[in-house]
């Protein structure tokens, strides 16, 4: 059984960083957001890379389209492989006006091999309320070729730049409002209060009230319009508390961590790996050891891992586990178990 032994002395308090940030970077205005749009259509003009005859919905869609053009044909009689059924999606930005252009994403839902060279037929795009907000149409782009872009790796999805035309606006009236609400991107009582204190100090009057860890209510000054007020608010710097965070992509095995995130004492076993983290000052370097970095050494005889002077951090742990041949899946499982046991105080975010 492989053993990993960490010996360290350090403060184990939760590490929180204080930094300056614009309010616009940490909070958004409630009600001012993108809106998802979706539609269904056909991409035509493919070079025999479209849906086959097993995609019955594609054949039915072709028949329906032809019928709308006064051409009567049964789905069973259609043999074309130059057409693909697709889902069409887009984001309608806040304050988008009728006639504005938006980008369109096209994704195959049948067994098409590629959408390269295809043209999306006119597609109504609807919101969650079922109303049509935009129309999409145009040539589909699937990126680069010869392994240099997204085209070769994922040819069944593509983009149409400026391929959508806004037909209906979403009404957002900020100008006539006296109050608006800010929503913090990450809930944090300290940051909510920091916005309140910063704005009230800046305007020398109470214009902001922290309602909870995510919400701050704003009242515009009497000598400004709401638009002028918000334009100023978004550019004001505040003291922003950033808690340490470990980001894990379970699909790719990618782990992103700050270098100073400490690990509290713990003893755990994962498969054939035993991890023991204890407090001990100035441990002796084991005989026959190999240096991992300036803080850690591995005892080659027993596959034990030691720290020298300094602290045991997530970054040290990950590097050391890699030295011992642990897989990304093993490392992710170990970090998740440590977080559950309270050995890691940083936020663990899975994506």
Swiss-Prot record:
Keywords: Bacterial flagellum, Periplasm, Signal. GO terms for cellular component: bacterial-type flagellum basal body, distal rod, P ring; outer membrane-bounded periplasmic space. GO terms for biological process: bacterial-type flagellum-dependent cell motility. InterPro entries: Flag_FlgI (IPR001782). GO terms for molecular function: structural molecule activity. Residues 1-20 form the signal peptide. It comes from the Bacteria. The keyword Signal applies. It is found in: Periplasm; Bacterial flagellum basal body. The basal body constitutes a major portion of the flagellar organelle and consists of four rings (L,P,S, and M) mounted on a central rod. Belongs to the FlgI family. NCBIfam families: PRK05303.1. Assembles around the rod to form the L-ring and probably protects the motor/basal body from shearing forces during rotation. This is Flagellar P-ring protein. It comes from Sulfurimonas denitrificans (strain ATCC 33889 / DSM 1251). The lineage of its organism: Bacteria, Pseudomonadati, Campylobacterota, Epsilonproteobacteria, Campylobacterales. The gene is flgI.
């Amino acid at each position: 059984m492989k053993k990993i032994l960490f010996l360290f002395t350090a403060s184990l308090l939760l590490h929180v960083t204080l930094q300056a940030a614009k309010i616009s970077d940490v909070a958004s205005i409630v009600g001012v957001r993108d809106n998802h749009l979706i539609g269904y259509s056909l991409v035509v003009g493919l070079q025999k890379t479209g849906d086959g005859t097993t995609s019955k919905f594609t054949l039915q869609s072709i028949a329906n389209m032809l019928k709308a053009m006064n051409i009567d044909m049964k789905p069973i009689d259609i043999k074309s492989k130059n057409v693909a059924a697709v889902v069409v999606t887009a984001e309608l930005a806040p304050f988008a006006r009728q006639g504005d252009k938006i980008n369109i994403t096209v994704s195959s839902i049948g067994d098409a091999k590629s959408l390269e060279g295809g043209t999306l037929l006119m597609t109504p795009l609807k919101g969650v309320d079922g109303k049509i907000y935009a129309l999409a149409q145009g040539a589909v782009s699937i990126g680069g070729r010869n392994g240099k872009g997204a085209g070769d790796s994922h040819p069944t999805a593509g983009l149409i730049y400026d391929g959508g035309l806004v037909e209906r606006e979403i009404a957002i009236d900020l100008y006539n409002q006296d109050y608006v609400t800010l929503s913090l991107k990450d809930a944090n009582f300290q940051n909510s209060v920091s916005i309140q204190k910063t704005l009230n100090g800046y305007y020398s009057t109470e214009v902001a009230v922290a309602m909870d860890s995510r919400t701050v209510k704003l009242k515009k000054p009497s000598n400004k319009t709401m638009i002028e007020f918000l334009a100023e608010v978004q550019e004001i710097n505040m003291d922003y508390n950033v808690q340490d965070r470990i980001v894990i992509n379970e699909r790719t095995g990618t782990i992103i961590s700050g270098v100073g995130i400490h690990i509290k004492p713990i003893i755990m076993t994962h498969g054939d790996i035993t991890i023991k983290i204890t407090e001990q000052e100035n441990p002796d370097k084991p005989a026959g050891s190999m240096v991992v970095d300036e803080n850690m050494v591995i005892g080659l005889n027993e596959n034990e891992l030691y720290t020298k002077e300094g602290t045991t951090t997530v970054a040290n742990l990950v590097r050391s586990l890699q030295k011992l041949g642990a897989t990304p899946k093993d490392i992710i499982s170990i970090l998740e178990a440590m977080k559950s046991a309270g050995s890691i105080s940083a936020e663990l975010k899975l994506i």
